[in-house]
């Protein structure tokens, strides 16, 4: 019995504890990201934001969660009930399992696999299925149109994201996310300079990938009421909401890992090494999340034709040129990484 526990149950228990240790803080971060968004946008619009529930409004996310938990879940009469219930669950679960390969600090990662980049790309591609299923199962023209918009938007910008990631792989020579971070320690400054415009394209692409302003066309209130989640209430709506914000944090962590050095200090100074890598990781992710909120508070929504034109006629040729340029420069300067 003891041998069985040591061989089979103990490893499973350790994995389960690791999953819980990542999931619970992440859900809390998602809850308080909604609070931060309302406060930041309120300050930018010269108003207070939530400030009544608890000191400085810090209990507002808990009040919102309790409210949504006790609301009545209403399923439309003509909806496909099984798919209607499954759609928000799929979206939320996919937004969580992407964290399995994100390194929080040196050696602190749930699954340090050698194809971490491909894993993240696969998960981000699958996340649109929950939205498509929601649009189809709702049996509503607004929800279905929002789902179609989301799938077209994802396809358009996933291509540019993939090409940008190829430039990172060319400079680091590995698909392992921890390896990418460690490789950034020794990259010459001119390679970082070449990757700067690619990182900007990547960040704009993840804005579109997560359906955030100025690319929130799948849920445009003025056109589609609320888009793919128009028929959802109670915990179904809450799971979509949590999935969107969990995806925001995930893509911010991905951008941090690929372009900002992950858990490494921002400058190569010896006294910064005494600060834990987890602090730098959280600081960089927090900065990118603030950029998400800043953009939402200041920029108007794109028209749908402008969104498609930007993806196919601007970003696609630009990233293709970037791949050719980076690979050519690395080849002729003999800086291609050894694989």
From Swiss-Prot:
Pfam families: NADHdh
Catalysed reaction, written as an equation: a quinone + NADH + 5 H(+)(in) = a quinol + NAD(+) + 4 H(+)(out)
UniProt main location, coarse: membrane
PROSITE patterns attached to this UniProt entry: COMPLEX1_ND1_1, COMPLEX1_ND1_2
Transmembrane intervals: 10-30, 50-70, 82-102, 115-135, 161-181, 187-207, 235-255, 275-295, 311-331
Alphabetic keyword roster: Cell inner membrane, Cell membrane, Membrane, NAD, Quinone, Translocase, Transmembrane, Transmembrane helix, Ubiquinone
Lineage: superkingdom: Bacteria
Subcellular location: Cell inner membrane
GO molecular function, one term: oxidoreductase activity, acting on NAD(P)H, quinone or similar compound as acceptor
Cell inner membrane in keyword set: yes
Membrane topology (UniProt): Multi-pass membrane protein
Matches recorded under InterPro entries: NADH_UbQ_OxRdtase_su1/FPO, NADH_UbQ_OxRdtase_su1_CS
Known role: NDH-1 shuttles electrons from NADH, via FMN and iron-sulfur (Fe-S) centers, to quinones in the respiratory chain. The immediate electron acceptor for the enzyme in this species is believed to be ubiquinone. Couples the redox reaction to proton translocation (for every two electrons transferred, four hydrogen ions are translocated across the cytoplasmic membrane), and thus conserves the redox energy in a proton gradient. This subunit may bind ubiquinone.
Assembly information from the UniProt record: NDH-1 is composed of 14 different subunits. Subunits NuoA, H, J, K, L, M, N constitute the membrane sector of the complex.
Protein name as it appears in the record: NADH-quinone oxidoreductase subunit H
Upper taxonomic lineage: Bacteria, Pseudomonadati, Pseudomonadota, Alphaproteobacteria, Rickettsiales
Gene: nuoH
